[in-house]
Design a protein with these regions (language model features):
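Alpha-helical transmembrane segments in multi-pass membrane proteins
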Residues: 60-63, 89
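Hydrophobic alpha-helical transmembrane segments
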Residues: 1-61, 96-198
Length: 198
């Protein structure tokens, strides 16, 4: 849904990337910093410190924005950087959900439903683009930002003691992630049909 605004977002983030370059900070620095913020978020959620965890989500997203902006501003994008960014994003998302499971706010069943959906929606896209010869498989009901918005809402609800709405938000994260997985799988099939795997 929000991917349609990606071009505008990338253009507006360039000045921040230039500022990062002046500080001699690399895209991979921001990628790893994003993962570190997610790790702190997991510990915060594990201790039921929801507002601190929410702050870490904001920091994580700012760092994620800066890694791409820095790469574009300095023409520093690499294949390895892209893979590293993709992997740390998934680790980060899993850590945040894991933190909510650690403190018991989210049941293991619901947490794994959400986490597995997040991972599989991303995995099918990666395989479609690497093995299916598809230039872009950014299709489906929800991308990363939509899922993070729902996660943020869940954290806010937990923070004010509204557990049921929070649980619903986590369930929606899982539901839209699994729907996106199916949509991407069907899209991939329609593109490659019976093309032999390589």
């Amino acid at each position: 849904m929000l991917t349609r605004f990606r071009a505008l977002y990338e253009k507006l983030s360039i000045p921040f990337g230039k500022a990062s370059l002046k500080l001699r900070l690399t895209p991979n620095f921001w990628t790893l910093f994003s993962l570190f913020a997610a790790l702190l978020g997991m510990f915060a959620f594990g201790a039921a410190r929801y507002w601190l965890g929410l702050l870490m989500i904001v920091v994580m997203n700012l760092a994620d924005m800066l890694d791409g902006a820095t790469a574009r501003a300095g023409n520093l994008g690499t294949a390895f950087g892209s893979v590293l960014d993709h992997c740390t994003d998934r680790y980060g998302e899993f850590m945040l959900v894991a933190g909510l499971m650690i403190n018991g706010a989210v049941s293991p069943l619901l947490g794994m439903f959400a986490a597995s959906g997040i991972v599989m929606a991303s995995y099918v896209r990666a395989k479609a683009e690497s093995m299916g010869g598809i230039k872009s498989c950014v299709v489906g009901l929800a991308g990363r930002q939509e899922k993070l918005i729902l996660l943020v809402l869940a954290v806010i609800f937990f923070g004010v003691g509204w557990d049921l709405p929070a649980q619903i938000m986590i369930a929606l994260v899982g539901l839209i992630s699994h729907i996106t997985f199916v949509q991407r799988l069907l899209y991939t099939r329609s593109k490659i049909l019976e093309k032999p795997a390589t």
